[in-house]
Amino acid sequence: MKSIKFIALFLAAFLALSGCNDNKSNTTQLTQSNSYKTGDEIELTSIIGSKATIVRTENGFKLKDSDKILMIDIFGTYCAPCQKEAPHLMDFQLKNADKFMIIGLIHFEDVNDEYVLENFSKKYNAYYFIANSKENSKIIDQILNDINYNRALSIPFKVVLKNGKYQSLSDNLDGTVVGNKFYLGEVSTNIISQDIDKILNEN
C-alpha cells in the first residue's frame, strides 16, 4: 500500500513539473513570407480589453516604448500546473510592475474571453495581461523558431526577454543556471526573481 501511495505522489509531482503536453511535435516551419519582420508591431488585446503592443526585434520581441523585462507565458486554462502557478505570477507582477510585465498567451484551446475570465482569471486570481487572440499561434511559432525549440510543446512554457533578446534562465527543476532560453512546466517565483535580478544586474 505504501509503494502505491509513493508511486501516485511521484506521478502527481512529475506531471506538475513537466507540464501539459499536446502530444504533437513542433513541426511548424515559419517561412520568410509569414514570419515577423524586424519592426513589426503586434497590438494585443487582453481578455478585459486592455491593450499592449509588442515589437519584433532582430531576434525576439520587446514591449513598445518600454525597457521592461518581458515574460511571455504560453498556457491553457485547463492545465493544472498553469492554474497552480497563476496566483503566484500575479503576485510577482504586482510587486515588480515597474520593471517587469508578463503577457499570457492562451494556447491549445478554442475558448472566448469571457470563459477565460470566469474559469481562469477569477478562479486563480490571474489578472495579469492575458491575450486570447488568433495572433497567439503565430507569436508562439515565432518564439519556438527563434530559440530553436523542436520538441513537443508542453505548457506552461515561458520565455523572458530583455531589450528584445531572449535571456538564459535557470532550470526550474533544480534551480541551476543551464542557459536554457525557456522555463518548461511549473516554475517558482523564487527562481523567476533570482533570474530577473541576474538579468537586471547584467544589463
Segments and roles (model prediction):
Residues 1-7:
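Bacterial N-terminal signal peptides that target proteins for export
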Residues 16-19:
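C-terminal motif of bacterial Sec signal peptides marking the signal peptidase cleavage site
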Residues 21-23:
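Bacterial signal peptide processing site
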Residues 43-70, 94:
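A short beta-strand-turn-helix
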Residues 72-79, 107:
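Aromatic-flanked redox-active Cys/Sec active sites in thiol-based oxidoreductases
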Residues 84-125, 137-143:
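Structural microenvironment flanking redox-active thiols in thiol-disulfide oxidoreductases
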Residues 120-163:
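Short, internal strand/loop/helix patches
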Residues 153-203:
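Thiol-/selenol-based redox modules, centered on thioredoxin-like
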